[in-house]
Swiss-Prot record:
It is found in: Secreted. It comes from the Eukaryota. Induction: Strongly down-regulated in muscle cell lines derived from biopsies of 5 Duchenne muscular dystrophy (DMD) patients compared to a normal muscle cell line. Gene3D superfamilies: Complement Module, domain 1, Laminin, Spermadhesin, CUB domain, Trypsin-like serine proteases. This is Inactive serine protease PAMR1. It comes from Homo sapiens (Human). The lineage of its organism: Eukaryota, Metazoa, Chordata, Craniata, Vertebrata. GO terms for molecular function: calcium ion binding.
């Protein structure tokens, strides 16, 4: 395939040569063709096509004409290989060519650009670099394409050196500067000694040659491009940079090098040493940081520190100091400790006590791009493995506690199997000093009981079942005394601080007046009806607030629902877990066809009964009864009732075993089906026992429940 492309390209060039050698009297064979040149390229060409592009400089539409011929499918195929819009990539101003509906030979003659970007030249603006001999000048490269290579050689007069200063630098950053970079060497070719290699956008200090020539190389790889760079240069003598300290005099010799004549009391090649007393030279601030004198006598002449001077070091934003924060000038003229460095790092994100964090071993992360796929298809495995790839720089330097190196990965998981994670499971320290992904958190898994089916629910511990107790205020009756607690209802735990309960359980009968929170409490993990038989694992929690639904009707018991906010969080365990809230769309079958499990304690049980000690949490299966049939059923027994949209009626399911009398429990109703967070079956809260007229538990009359589905949004708003 590649050979065919090169053959076609070669033929195209041959055709172009033939065009230039045509005699003037050449007559067009096909008068419908755009011109003689097109006829030579495609003998039967009678049409042309236009390539539409955008000029990068001014963003106007440009283009050019190419000959084309109709194929068997009546499509116009190009008669020659053309480069598409890449010919305009480095243009600052483009020639409009044919993009206006007229015929031309724009592409054939190759007038691509009216003006190139600064630093680029040639018909396609892809050439760069030159030899510079002026005493001063500039090197400007405005933007750059992928895989660019440019070389400049600067020559100075004998006895002079060259000083190069970067005015602007915008290249891809890397600690090793191995992708996009400017490399400065002493001498006039690439074999000279490297003085400096720069990348990123931080301008280096002025660069000075050793001899009278300087070689500048720019290189870009095939992944990213930035704005380029701008540098100025000038010829100077070795003394131009004032290399002598302490007012020493710089003297040039015949070879162009220099010597320093020092004042009394100073010595050294650059007069840098003080003879009169010991002191410490300025340690300088770390790269990407700075220093401050925070103690002691300070500096001498701004360059040396007296004995006892304390210097503190600081880093710029998103950098962290590694090493000694302070250094002191000692009696021997040396600084204490080691010079610190500033490292790009990320502060560890805060997590809750429910989340466990683990630092993963440092490893190279790879990304597969379309270029990798191209290499995989075009080259052998051996050649592909030898192709250069980018690797992140290895971390260096120790960081203070609470910080992590660039590219460090943190893995998160919940500390307990009863919780599930929200947010990212893995986060990476980015170059910006921030972490990828979202902050993790752990919330309790709702509605999960292992290996439980609806027909086998008797004698089970339902971990979301909450026992609601009220404090007595009347005189004792033989079994209760003033101030004692007695069980009044069951509620459902929906998160660590929220219990959903029927509103009539926490209000005065027939009123909307709420019972004082001090006279109510919630017990979780309870199983036996007798409080004396409860295990030590139960949790007795105080209530901080009662939220009554605003539409609660204490007469009809419409909107019979309330929320209890717990003062302390419930401790999630095998015995205490929340139940899920369901939405209508979550039900796989219609609500009327659902088999619902009801659970609760017999709140009317006689404490003096022989079986009271062994009475436990009861459960059974009920079926939903049509609201109209429920009303007619009660009317047949002389009890007129109204079943609202916020209620549903249910009666005992004769095919399923049951040990519960729903009229005596004040319990909760739940259904098991797969949830949105997990395909595994989860139990969802569907209702709360509201009212019943079946005094004998004969199952002749249905029990009315508060339907939880219409109140889902209201519950979730108050769960936060």
């Amino acid at each position: 395939m590649e050979l065919g492309c090169w053959t076609q390209l070669g033929l195209t060039f041959l055709q172009l040569l033939l065009i230039s050698s045509l005699p003037r009297e050449y007559t067009v064979i096909n008068e419908a063709c755009p011109g003689a040149e097109w006829n030579i390229m495609c003998r039967e060409c009678c049409e042309y096509d236009q390539i539409e592009c955008v000029c990068p400089g001014k963003r106007e539409v440009v283009g050019y004409t190419i000959p084309c011929c109709r194929n068997e499918e009546n499509e116009c195929d190009s008669c020659l290989i053309h480069p598409g819009c890449t010919i305009f990539e480095n243009c600052k101003s483009c020639r409009n060519g044919s993009w206006g509906g007229t015929l031309d030979d724009f592409y054939v003659k190759g007038f691509y650009c009216a003006e190139c970007r600064a630093g680029w030249y040639g018909g396609d603006c892809m050439r760069c670099g030159q030899v510079l001999r002026a005493p001063k000048g500039q090197i400007l490269l405005e933007s750059y394409p992928l895989n660019a290579h440019c070389e400049w050689t600067i020559h100075a007069k004998p006895g002079f050196v060259i000083q190069l200063r970067f005015v602007m630098l915008s290249l891809e950053f890397d600690y090793m500067c191995q992708y996009d970079y400017v490399e400065v060497r002493d001498g006039d070719n690439r074999d000279g000694q490297i003085i400096k290699r720069v990348c990123g956008n931080e301008r280096p200090a002025p660069i000075q040659s050793i001899g009278s020539s300087l070689h500048v190389l720019f290189h870009s790889d095939g992944s990213k491009n930035f704005d380029g760079f701008h540098a100025i240069y000038e010829e100077i003598t070795a003394c131009s940079s004032s290399p002598c300290f302490h007012d020493g005099t710089c003297v040039l010799d015949k070879a162009g090098s220099y010597k320093c004549a020092c004042l009394a009391g100073y010595t050294g090649q650059r007069c840098e040493n003080l003879l009169e007393e010991r002191n410490c030279s300025d340690p300088g601030g770390p790269v990407n940081g700075y220093q401050k004198i925070t103690g002691g006598p300070g500096l001498i002449n701004g360059r040396h520190a007296k004995i006892g001077t304390v210097v503190s070091f600081f880093c710029n934003n998103s950098y962290v100091l590694s090493g000694n924060e302070k250094r002191t000038c000692q009696q021997n003229g040396e600084w204490s400790g080691k010079q610190p460095i500033c490292i790009k790092a990320c502060r560890e994100p805060k997590i809750s006590d429910l989340v466990r964090r683990r630092v993963l071993p440092m490893q190279v992360q790879s990304r597969e791009t379309p270029l990798h796929q191209l290499y995989s298809a075009a080259f052998s495995k051996q050649k592909l493995q030898s192709a250069p790839t980018k690797k992140p720089a290895l971390p260096f330097g120790d960081l203070p506690m609470g910080y992590q190196h660039l590219h460090t990965q943190l893995q998160y998981e919940c500390i307990s199997p009863f919780y599930r994670r929200l947010g990212s499971s893995r986060r990476t320290c980015l170059r910006t000093g921030k972490w990828s992904g979202r902050a993790p958190s752990c919330i309790p898994i709702c509605g999960k009981i292992e290996n439980i089916t609806a027909p086998k629910t008797q004698g089970l511990r339902w971990p979301w079942q909450a026992a609601i107790y009220r404090r007595t205020s009347g005189v004792h009756d033989g079994s209760l005394h003033k101030g004692a607690w007695f069980l009044v209802c069951s509620g459902a735990l929906v998160n660590e601080r929220t219990v959903v309960v029927a509103a009539h359980c926490v209000t005065d009968l027939g009123k909307v007046t709420m019972i004082k929170t001090a006279d109510l409490k919630v017990v979780l993990g309870k199983f036996y009806r007798d409080d004396d038989r409860d295990e030590k694992t139960i949790q007795s929690l105080q209530i901080s607030a009662i939220i009554l639904h605003p539409n609660y009707d204490p007469i009809l018991l419409d909107a019979d629902i309330a929320i209890l906010k717990l003062l302390d969080k419930a401790r999630i365990s095998t015995r205490v877990q929340p139940i899920c809230l369901a939405a209508s769309r979550d039900l796989s079958t219609s609500f009327q066809e659902s088999h619902i499990t009801v659970a609760g304690w017999n709140v009317l049980a006689d404490v003096r009964s022989p079986g009271f000690k062994n009475d436990t949490l009861r459960s059974g299966v009920v079926s939903v009864v049509d609201s109209l049939l429920c009303e007619e059923q009660h009317e047949d027994h002389g009890i007129p009732v109204s079943v609202t949209d916020n209620m549903f009626c249910a009666s005992w399911e004769p095919t399923a075993p049951s040990d519960i009398c729903t009229a005596e429990t004040g319990g909760i109703a739940a259904v098991s089906f797969p949830g949105r967070a997990s395909p595994e079956p989860r139990w969802h809260l569907m209702g709360l026992v509201s009212w019943s007229y079946d005094k004998t538990c004969s199952h002749r009359l249905s029990t009315a429940f508060t339907k939880v589905l219409p109140f889902k949004d209201w519950i979730e708003r108050n769960m936060k």
